[in-house]
Structures are given as structure tokens and as C-alpha cells.
């Protein structure tokens, strides 16, 4: 009799344990409400962030937060998936603090390449946005580079540009995942 009870207990423990494990292995995206953002994956210094929708595939973006020397978040650099046109094949939005000197533009320098300047398009409560259109050559630089420097100028300290490091570690894999999504 005791053997039968033991067998039944082992059976139910195994079944219940398997069920509990299956319940705890649900992905982050399955637990997100419609309209909420979730992190789908990390690629080196980049993260693939998506918004839960009713669509078959949730829209995503590849992003990285740039921090100053004291570790505070300063800039959000976001790569977007969009339909390429004649010369621009990729795009990015870069959000800087509201106190950025807009006339100085956003400057991006990849490795030893010449720096490129981008005008700010608009400002919102969360910050000022520069939109970057990338050509095939530009995108190749991001994929082949190790790091880039993003330079913004604080409005209250125009003689002290702030240089922030943009890691390109994981960019190629992250961008491939963005496009494949």
C-alpha cells in the first residue's frame, strides 16, 4: 500500500513540477500588455526594444543609452527599420536633453572617420530629437566600427561640448535582428 502511495506522489509531483516550470518559462513579451514596450533581446551594447501590438510581428527598434562620465543617462540613440529610398537605407533618432544648444547640431564621429553633423528636428518634453538618415556607406561604418563619439553642446556651457561614447559592439547582429523582425 505504501508503495502505491509513493508512486502516486512521485507522479503528481513530477506533473505539477513540470507544469510549474512551464508556467515560469513564459517570455517577457508574453507578459506585456498591448501598447507597452518590452526588451526582446540584447546584442552587445545594443537592445532590441519592441511595442506589444495585435499584429503578427511587434514593431521594434534597436537602441542604446549613452551615459556621461558620472554614469548618468544623457542620450538615447535609436536605430529604426523603415523602407529605404534612393539614397537613405537606414535611419536613427537621437534624443538629447532639452538644454542642448540646437544650433551646434548633433555630431557623430565613428572611429577615425570625419565627423558628421545632423540638425535637430524638434523638441518634446522628453528631449530634443535629431533624425539621421544613413546611406549604405554610413551603415557600413557603423557595422565595421568599434565605437563612435556623439557630441552635444549644453546650452548653458557652449564652450564645453559633451563627448559621449557610442559602443558599436553588437551593432551588426542587432541591426540584422531589427531588419529580420
Segment roles from a protein language model:
Residues 1-5:
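Positively charged n-region of N-terminal signal peptides that target proteins for export
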Residues 22-181:
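A generic "folded-domain core" signal
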